[in-house]
Amino acid sequence: MINNLQLDSLVPGKRPEETTVVVAMSGGVDSSVVAVLLHKMGYKVIGATMQLYSSPNASSGKSCCGNADIYDAKKVAASFGFPHYVLNYEEVFRKEVIEDFVNSYKAGETPIPCIKCNQTVKFRDMLKMARTIGGDVVATGHYVRRLEVEGELQIWSGKDKNKDQSYFLFSMTLEQLKFVRFPLGNLVKGDVRKIAQYLNIEVADKPDSQDICFVPKNYKKTLASLDPSAIKKGKIHHIDGSVLGEHDGIANFTVGQRKGLGIAYPYPLYVVALDPVKNTVIVGPSSSLVKTQLFLRDLNWLSKDQIPEHGLSASVRLRSSSSAVQATISRSAKDGKGRVVLHEGCVVSPGQACVIYDNERLLGGGWILNQVRYSETA
């Protein structure tokens, strides 16, 4: 198991005892195993945990980066004798992640704050801190593979397909990738737990984090407390234009939703679109959910080979848990937005990430635009 770790020459030309590794420790089993193994192999390990959101109600036991997680990370570091620091990023997290979360829902989108956190706090601010204190590299517990192919750094899906986290890293830059290592990429979760148990790491049996750290139970209540203006009543329209009822705020709905509409109708209705300009929830039959085209903003590209003018054939994932589908990707020379033509119809949720792959290699991705809004401004 341990031989499968991506640990060969974390920094080419430097021995472990000459190499300072800042390990991003969440307090969970994955990053703890990374930190302890590197420490035992002779690397100069510095554990670092981000303090993102202080609230007695924020940590449900299934979220990350709460006070209990900080305590767990510090306890692991103390047990094995390497330094650990807590990084207070609450202010930047509030501005970059929480406010974006609220604004996305108000714009009729369904956001993914964990990717925003990776994009800003973790792989921007934390890497800057690591360089400041003399770190040679940063290591994390993500289940992805970092490969160098013909001199080009690439991200590939993790060996454990059930835990692969490449979807959440599409917004990384190549400059960041030079500085980051993913030692667990060739392992499966079960083996990582066995390593943790073998090494007597105290969090070996700790459950995986699942919830959003600042949304303990009910995101609707969280939205209302963060920004009451996000909850504004409006009309529910059928796709044929008829008014079917009222809603209590478009932020309470997401594309594809069926439950909670409060409308009696001859056939099941689903949310097919959200119009933030008109404050309207648009519903229709399940067949109206299926899309074959979508547009992307903030398209990030991780390959030296750019998207050709005639388009690129690749596979895309529209949710972290969804299977890949074939598509043709192109990029507007005018505004840089991505255009994705799906080879088969899918349910598309604005605000989610469309992540692009060449088999198991991560090529890049972008944020799915709300086509109701985009069509008005395009």
Curated annotation (Swiss-Prot):
It catalyses: S-sulfanyl-L-cysteinyl-[protein] + uridine(34) in tRNA + AH2 + ATP = 2-thiouridine(34) in tRNA + L-cysteinyl-[protein] + A + AMP + diphosphate + H(+). Pfam families: tRNA_Me_trans, tRNA_Me_trans_C, tRNA_Me_trans_M. One of its GO terms (molecular function) is tRNA-uridine 2-sulfurtransferase activity. The record marks 142, 352 as: Interaction with tRNA. The keyword tRNA processing applies. Its EC number is 2.8.1.13. Gene3D superfamilies: Adenine nucleotide alpha hydrolases-like domains (2.30.30.280), HUPs (3.40.50.620), Translation factors (2.40.30.10). ATP binds at residues 24-31, 50, 141. GO terms for biological process: tRNA wobble position uridine thiolation. Residues 163-165 are annotated as: Interaction with tRNA. InterPro entries: MnmA-like, MnmA-like_C, MnmA-like_central, MnmA-like_central_sf, Rossmann-like_a/b/a_fold. The active site is at residues 117, 213. Catalyzes the 2-thiolation of uridine at the wobble position (U34) of tRNA, leading to the formation of s(2)U34. Belongs to the MnmA/TRMU family. This is tRNA-specific 2-thiouridylase MnmA. It comes from Anaplasma phagocytophilum (strain HZ).
